[in-house]
């Protein structure tokens, strides 16, 4: 909108107009006004100061007392005027200059008017007196004249109103003066037609009072649109325009011209994409505008804009094919590497797709789903892909496509490079589980299924076995079938057995070790009839024992009377109490924490681990980035947590406890545990490496760079991970954006399980009561958890609502700079965080649902995932934003806009609004005072180097707040 002061200054040059209703100065014939009595006023001819003939009225009965001489004009039509102005030109004789006066000499006369709906006045009607005539004023001269002087003309202007009837008469009363009424001009004032700020305002008559303001509605000039409504100006009593309300700016495709009085079309080759005060701009690179008034420049042939790119963005093209493709075949896998295309299309978002085709003779078809790609098949960011699970001795053709953000706009398939390979002979895969088909004192009968991928003809199977605990004294036998009977075994002995297959390419991997036991020698000699009762009795006793154990466990759970030793076993049994659902087991219920680590975490040999650099510090020690290289697996980056030297046993237990927790989880949105190192120093926990680090800092570094759909996708991933945890009866207790990690593909994963605890399943709303004195992250924690230290999945839902707010505000601190106590007080008074800038209403409503005081009314994580899926499918619902509190039952906190006057310099102001990184940009460009900063536009920000859209929006909003504060504190000149 145009600033109000600017519009007023533009209008100040437009002078008010006067329109005459009657003027005796130009009358040359008789005026024929009515005089009473006949001996009073008389009409005479004379000359004005320019020697022009005029008709005047005069009276000079000063020698007679009790004078009451009246003069009335003809009927004057009102013409919709509410206030009338009368200009009187007259002369008055100085009474002292008249000799021998016997009467009462006056030097004034009275001025009246009378309203009427028609020209109905007569010589005796209305009565010649005040009321019905309405007195306007007593007219006194500024100067009178004597006999020696020439007549000195006085000019007086009087006004009266409001008048509402069809017309009026003017009347003059003489009470004994020597007066000459030279001319009478009757007129009214009006504000002239004007155009300013791309708006036209009609000619407007002033109001009924001198102080009246008459509203004149405005209309935008052609090709301009209203910025705010209503569009109007006020006409004051002097016929001057003032107090503009609303404004217009040129529409998209048009720019200002004629000193803001017209909008002209953009010329060919230029465009203007948005309504506003800006000028037309040359078309961006690789685009054109072939007609005038263009709002966007269309891309030239072969160039495109991606979805979401603005009209200001240059058009780009698809990349050329990848170059220098290298293939490295290893049996039934291949590693493909390539160099980037020679032409990237003017973009930096190049991705790669690897299309696999299996060729039989001359016919090639798409590979089946068994073929695996690492890291993935489509949308690969790095220039290396490993393809495995190919068939042996088979020809394959791989197309490596290069795509970017505009490839989907091109009608052509992406450019690609083709490489053909032939796989080698490979050894068979491992044998599935080995099973027992009979056990005697001196023999075992076993069977197994063939390998899933034989990769050729199976020649035979090798069976390796040894008595448990005597791995060095093993034996092997071979079999050409999938069964074997092994003789010469020791009675009542446990044997460990492994099987592997052999082809012409060699042996495959051994199966997983299985344990089988031969029976006692007496049992071997027993007859089948003797064994049946024993078997039946054993089975019956076993069933009774299992039922008894289950009943005991259920009773113990319901009464909560488990002791420490019982807890270890009953919690493990939970995995079997809920069909199809794996429940979390608290590692702190183990008497020996090392047993929990062995159960849930994989031990990794220290020789497989290489620490590269320290990237941070944790509660127990340093956090490092490193590499993990295990046999048969590709080298991978990992995050390594180390336990500092001089630790206590309790610290070691707590440190490894987090690994025991993570090892129980298997979900794409939960951080994955790779293993632990406990047999050497330092003790380590290895997890997958997340390239983009913590979510809060990642969002702050990429402020404004994601679409709403992408942000909702991030929220959906976090909710999916929390749904998985809640279904395992697991409470996180410390869910916050700082504890969400982001990988290179923007997949978010829940991490940091240091504060988490097991969630009991003995009632519908399980809780955990923390130890007194435990640290609680106030800004993310539900009120019941703060007050009573009770944590539930519902309190995790509250924390998830705060995470939603962090994501939509690009990592802003919840509750800003409020103290923890102020946060607690605000929540207790039912205040909730307002929607972040440009946050869709549906997302803020979901946040408010997560922050309901009654935890039983908060949504479950499964419901949150479902709600986010619906929003993603219906993207239109994400375009509705709610700037206010309409429809919101909770009160919303209001972050006060910092007053610029409290900051001594522009640099201090930038620091206060978290934009301190641009101090040098502002100062170098000359924006060193608040007066200059308040005039900045989006083009100015772009010119000084503020290129991030989110930062531009934040700065422009702060500049707008500064303008508002200036308008409220500085006087406006009218």
Swiss-Prot record:
Swiss-Prot/TrEMBL GO biological process terms: axon guidance; axonal fasciculation; cell migration; dendritic spine development; dendritic spine morphogenesis; ephrin receptor signaling pathway; positive regulation of synapse assembly; protein autophosphorylation
Active-site residues per Swiss-Prot or TrEMBL entry: 734 (proton acceptor)
Protein name in UniProt: Ephrin type-B receptor 3
Catalytic activity as recorded in UniProt: L-tyrosyl-[protein] + ATP = O-phospho-L-tyrosyl-[protein] + ADP + H(+)
Domain (Fibronectin type-III): residue spans on this chain: 318-426, 427-522
Location within or outside the cell: Cell membrane; Cell projection, Dendrite
Binding site for ATP: 615-623, 641
Glycosylated residue positions: 330, 420
Tissue expression pattern: Expressed in the embryo in pre-somitic mesoderm, caudal somites, midbrain, and cement gland. Most abundant in adult brain, eye, heart, lung and ovary. Lower levels in intestine, kidney, oviduct and pharynx.
Residues of the Protein kinase domain: 609-872
One of the Pfam families matching this protein, by short name: fn3
């Amino acid at each position: 909108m145009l600033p109000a002061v600017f519009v007023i200054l533009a209008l100040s040059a437009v002078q008010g107009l006067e329109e005459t209703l009657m003027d005796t100065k130009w009358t040359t014939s008789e005026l024929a006004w009515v005089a009473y009595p006949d001996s009073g006023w008389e009409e005479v001819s004379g000359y004005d100061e320019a020697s022009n003939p005029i008709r005047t009225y005069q009276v000079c009965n000063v020698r007679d007392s009790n004078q009451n001489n009246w003069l009335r004009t003809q009927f004057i039509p009102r013409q919709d005027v509410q206030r009338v102005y009368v200009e009187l030109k007259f002369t008055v004789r100085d009474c002292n200059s008249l000799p021998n006066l016997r009467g009462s000499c006056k030097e004034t006369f009275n001025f009246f008017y009378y309203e009427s709906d028609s020209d109905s006045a007569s010589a005796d009607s209305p009565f010649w007196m005040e009321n019905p005539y309405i007195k306007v004023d007593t007219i006194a001269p500024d100067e009178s004249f004597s006999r020696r002087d020439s007549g000195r003309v006085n000019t007086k202007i009087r006004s009266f109103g409001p008048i509402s009837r069809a017309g009026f008469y003017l009347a003059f009363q003489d009470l004994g003066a020597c007066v000459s009424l030279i001319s009478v001009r009757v007129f009214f004032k009006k504000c002239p037609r004007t155009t300013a700020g791309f708006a036209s305002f009609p000619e407007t008559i002033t109001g009924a009072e001198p102080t009246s303001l008459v509203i004149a509605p405005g209309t935008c000039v052609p090709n301009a649109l209203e910025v705010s409504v209503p569009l109007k100006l006020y006409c004051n009593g002097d016929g001057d325009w003032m107090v503009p309300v609303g404004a217009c700016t040129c529409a998209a495709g048009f720019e200002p011209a004629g000193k803001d009085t017209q909008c002209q079309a953009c010329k060919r080759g230029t465009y203007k994409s948005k309504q506003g005060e800006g000028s037309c701009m040359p078309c961006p690179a690789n685009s054109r505008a072939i007609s005038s008034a263009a709002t966007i420049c269309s891309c030239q042939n072969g160039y495109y804009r991606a979805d979401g790119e603005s009209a200001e963005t240059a058009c780009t093209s698809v990349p050329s094919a990848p170059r220098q493709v290298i293939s490295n075949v290893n049996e039934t896998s291949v590693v493909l590497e390539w160099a980037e295309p020679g032409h990237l299309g003017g973009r930096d978002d190049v991705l790669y797709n690897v299309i696999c085709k299996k060729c039989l003779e001359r016919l090639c078809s798409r590979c089946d789903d068994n073929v695996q790609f690492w890291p993935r098949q489509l949308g690969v960011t790095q220039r290396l892909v490993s393809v495995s699970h190919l068939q042996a001795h088979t020809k394959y053709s791989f197309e490596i496509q290069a795509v970017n953000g505009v490839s989907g706009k091109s009608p052509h398939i992406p450019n690609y490079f083709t490489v053909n390979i032939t796989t080698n002979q490979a050894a068979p895969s491992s044998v599935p589980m080995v099973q027992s088909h009979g056990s005697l004192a001196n023999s075992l009968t076993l069977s197994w299924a063939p390998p899933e991928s034989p990769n050729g003809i199976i020649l035979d199977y090798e069976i390796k076995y040894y008595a448990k605990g005597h791995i060095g004294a093993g034996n092997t036998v071979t079999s050409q079938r999938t069964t074997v009977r092994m003789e010469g075994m020791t009675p009542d002995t446990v044997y460990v057995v492994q099987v592997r297959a052999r082809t012409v390419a060699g042996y495959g991997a051994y199966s997983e070790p299985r344990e089988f036991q031969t029976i006692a020698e007496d049992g071997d000699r027993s007859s089948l009839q003797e064994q049946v009762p024993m078997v039946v009795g054993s089975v019956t006793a076993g069933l009774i024992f299992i039922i008894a154990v289950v009943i005991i466990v259920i009773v113990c759970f319901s009464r909560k009377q488990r002791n420490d030793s019982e807890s270890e076993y009953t919690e493990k049994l939970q995995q079997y109490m809920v069909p199809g659902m794996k429940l979390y087991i608290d590692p702190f219920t183990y008497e020996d924490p090392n047993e929990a680590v062995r159960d849930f975490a994989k031990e990794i040999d220290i020789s497989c681990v290489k620490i590269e650099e320290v990237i941070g510090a944790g509660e127990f020690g340093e956090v490092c980035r490193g590499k993990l290289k295990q046999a048969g697996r590709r080298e991978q980056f990992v995050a390594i947590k180390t336990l500092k030297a001089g630790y206590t046993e309790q610290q070691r237990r707590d440190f490894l406890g987090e690994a025991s927790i993570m090892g129980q989880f298997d979900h794409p949105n939960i951080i994955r545990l790779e293993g632990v190192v406990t047999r050497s120093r330092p003790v380590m926990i290895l997890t997958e490496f997340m390239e983009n680090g913590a979510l809060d800092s990642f969002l702050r570094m990429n402020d404004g760079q994601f679409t709403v759909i992408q942000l909702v996708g991030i929220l959906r991933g976090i909710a999916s991970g929390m749904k998985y945890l809640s279904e395992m009866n697991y409470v996180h207790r410390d869910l916050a954006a700082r504890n969400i990690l982001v990988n290179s593909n923007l997949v978010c994963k829940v991490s940091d399980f240091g504060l988490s605890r097991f969630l009991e399943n003995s009632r519908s709303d399980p809780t955990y009561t923390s130890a007194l004195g435990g640290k609680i992250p106030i800004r993310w924690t539900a009120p019941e958890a703060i007050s009573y230290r009770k944590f539930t999945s519902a309190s995790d839902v509250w924390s998830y609502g705060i995470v939603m707010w962090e994501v939509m505000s690009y990592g802003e601190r919840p509750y800003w700079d409020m103290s923890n106590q102020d946060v607690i007080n605000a929540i207790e008074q039912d205040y909730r965080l307002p929607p972040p800038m440009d946050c869709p209403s549906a997302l803020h409503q979901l946040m408010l649902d997560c922050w309901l005081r009654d935890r039983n009314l908060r949504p479950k994580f499964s419901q949150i995932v479902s709600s986010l899926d619906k929003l993603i499918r219906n993207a239109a619902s994400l375009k509705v934003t709610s700037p206010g509190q309409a429809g919101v039952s909770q009160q919303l906190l209001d972050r006060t806009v910092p007053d610029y006057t409290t900051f001594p310099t522009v640099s201090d102001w930038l620091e206060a609004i978290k934009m301190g990184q641009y101090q040098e940009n502002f100062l170098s460009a000359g924006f060193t005072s608040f007066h200059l900063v308040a005039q900045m536009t989006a083009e100015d920000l772009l010119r000084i180097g503020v290129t991030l859209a989110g930062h531009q929006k934040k700065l422009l909003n702060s500049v707008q707040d500064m303008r508002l504060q200036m308008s409220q504190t500085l006087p406006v000149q009218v």
